[in-house]
């Protein structure tokens, strides 16, 4: 094993500016032979970001080199900027999906009319914000990592665009957006407990895959907004711009400048810059807390003691008698008590101040999977909710439905009593009206019911 890094220029000499011809020394000949061996093994071993680091001014990786099989294989399609303008309708506001640290994201649609061999499907196109905090290096990191890594719980990178200053990435479209919006947006309905566990298991599997690679990958920016959900709430990790190659051999950590998101980063990483896979485990513990509590990692609108989620909630994770104090009130008790205890205990381990005390992500997966099979979830009352993006309307309709249920039951009881008195004892066992018929209501029923109550209230006020 060669201790020093092997210069990329020996593998792809056309990436570099021409230098004066000179004789190659025997030692360099040996390095070239080793590099050729590495190059021939690229289909077996993942290319590390450090191999193509652009820190040196003498290094320049061309588009041709990037698209060659020697770097990322032939998994990715290369799009022109004009093609991406077509599929996103010139990046129209109607197709705007959101904006992250990298830049804005727009929805588009690709098929074989754009490029031969393309599968017809919706896509998400991410455009680098030239005035933002990220740049070419983060874009290149994303291309290199996702160009080589394939897993059911990693978002699929379909292709990219590199034209002059423009840097774009084309991903599979994730219909339900990111976890952050589902948990914290006031316009989103409450995620059921079973869905939250499913998301946690999927995200954990994605991290476990990265950590278990022959050349480990440290995600470094694990958070709710980077967990994307498909139409079936299958979780996939996205945004690999800050990912780093993990330590290999006898190394215990990677020393790097502190990057990531406040509230999610592990304390030892913030203090020392020492990055390990256990740094990701800590971040996963924060997201587990968000799933349990329905609160974001940092919330300036809370009282001072509750602004940092970990500081507020972690002390209560070990005391199951206090667990109900931190459970998301929107769940309304509809969760497995045993499952909540197990998730709380796991989150407590992940958030340990000692990195060595945190579990590996593979063990996290083993702990979470059985929780998804627990069935001790209370059965709540049926509530009809009119599809709406406004939570206030949903709550109002739900309340109206409950009241309507009560009145219908009262009417049914009155009718039965009258019928019994009218027709005698032999009619007492007459089949009752179907309860299912009263379980579904149309929008019109709800509106009429609301209007009738409004008129009744007005009459009472006039009296």
UniProtKB/Swiss-Prot annotation:
Q: What is this protein called?
A: EPD1-interacting receptor-like cytoplasmic serine/threonine-protein kinase
Which residues constitute the catalytic centre? 221 (proton acceptor)
Residues holding ATP: 97-105, 126
Q: Where located?
A: Cell membrane
**In what residue span(s) does the Protein kinase domain sit?**
91-383
What does the PTM comment of the record read?
Phosphorylated at Tyr-171 and Tyr-173 in the presence of pathogen-associated molecular patterns (PAMPs); this triggers the expression of pathogenesis-related genes.
What's the source species for this entry? Nicotiana benthamiana
Catalytic activity, reaction form: L-seryl-[protein] + ATP = O-phospho-L-seryl-[protein] + ADP + H(+); L-threonyl-[protein] + ATP = O-phospho-L-threonyl-[protein] + ADP + H(+)
Q: Which residues carry this modification: Phosphotyrosine?
A: 171, 173
Q: What does this protein do?
A: Required for pathogen-associated molecular pattern (PAMP, e.g. chitin and flg22)-triggered immunity (PTI) involving reactive oxygen species (ROS) accumulation and triggering plant defense, including defense-related gene expression (e.g. PR1 and LOX). Ensures specific recognition of the EPD1 effector of Verticillium dahliae, resulting in a hypersensitive response known as effector-triggered immunity (ETI), characterized by the activation of programmed cell death to limit infection by the pathogen.
Q: Which family does it belong to?
A: Belongs to the protein kinase superfamily. Ser/Thr protein kinase family.
What triggers expression? Induced by the V.dahliae elicitor EPD1 (AC G2WWH6).
E.C. number(s) listed in UniProt: 2.7.11.1
Give the highest taxon in the source lineage: Eukaryota
Complex formation: Interacts with the V.dahliae elicitor EPD1 (AC G2WWH6).
Which coarse location class applies to the principal site listed for this UniProt protein? membrane
Which keywords are on file for this protein?
A: ATP-binding, Cell membrane, Hypersensitive response elicitation, Kinase, Membrane, Nucleotide-binding, Phosphoprotein, Plant defense, Serine/threonine-protein kinase, Transferase
Residue intervals passing through the bilayer: none
């Amino acid at each position: 094993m060669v201790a020093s890094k092997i210069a990329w220029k020996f593998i792809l000499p056309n990436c570099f500016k021409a230098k004066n011809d000179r004789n190659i020394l025997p030692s360099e000949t040996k390095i070239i032979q080793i590099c050729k061996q590495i190059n021939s093994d690229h289909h077996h071993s993942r290319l590390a970001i450090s191999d193509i680091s652009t820190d040196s001014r003498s290094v320049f990786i061309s588009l041709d080199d990037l698209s060659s099989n020697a770097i990322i294989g032939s998994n990715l399609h290369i799009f022109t900027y004009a093609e991406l303008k077509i599929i996103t309708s010139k990046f129209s506001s109607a197709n705007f999906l959101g904006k992250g640290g990298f830049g804005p994201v727009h929805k588009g649609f690709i098929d074989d009319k754009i490029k031969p061999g393309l599968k017809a499907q919706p896509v998400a196109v991410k455009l680098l914000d030239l005035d933002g905090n990220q740049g070419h290096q983060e874009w290149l990191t994303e291309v290199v990592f996702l160009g080589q890594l394939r897993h059911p719980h990693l978002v699929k990178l379909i292709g990219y665009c590199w034209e002059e200053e423009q840097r774009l990435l084309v991903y599979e479209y994730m219909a339900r957006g990111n976890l952050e919006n589902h948990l914290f947006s006031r316009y989103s309905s409450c995620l059921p407990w079973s869905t939250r566990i499913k998301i946690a298991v999927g995200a954990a599997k994605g991290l476990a895959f990265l950590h278990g690679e022959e050349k480990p990958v440290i995600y470094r920016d694990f958070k709710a907004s980077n967990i994307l959900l498909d139409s079936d709430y299958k979780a996939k990790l996205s945004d690999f711009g800050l990912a780093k190659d993990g330590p290999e051999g006898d190394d215990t950590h990677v020393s790097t400048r502190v990057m990531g998101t406040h509230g999610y980063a592990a304390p030892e990483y913030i203090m020392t810059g020492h990055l390990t896979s256990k740094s990701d485990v800590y971040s996963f513990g924060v997201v587990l807390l968000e799933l349990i509590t329905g609160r974001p990692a940092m919330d300036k609108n809370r009282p001072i003691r509750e602004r940092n989620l970990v500081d507020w909630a972690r002390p209560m994770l070990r005391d199951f008698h206090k667990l109900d104090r931190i459970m998301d009130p929107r769940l309304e008790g509809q969760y497995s008590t045993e499952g909540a205890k197990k998730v709380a205990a796991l989150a407590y381990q992940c958030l340990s101040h000692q990195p060595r005390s945190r579990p590996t992500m593979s063990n996290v997966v083993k702990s979470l999977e059985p929780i998804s099979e627990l069935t001790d979830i209370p059965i709540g009352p049926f509530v009809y909710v009119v599809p709406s993006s406004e939570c206030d309307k949903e709550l109002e309709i739900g309340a109206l439905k409950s009241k309507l249920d009560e009145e219908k039951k009262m009417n049914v009881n009155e009718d039965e009593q009258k019928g019994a008195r009218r027709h005698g004892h032999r009619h007492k066992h007459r089949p009752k009206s179907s309860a299912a018929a009263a379980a579904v209501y149309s929008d019109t029923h709800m509106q009429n019911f609301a209007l009738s109550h409004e008129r009744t209230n007005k009459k009472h006020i006039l009296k």
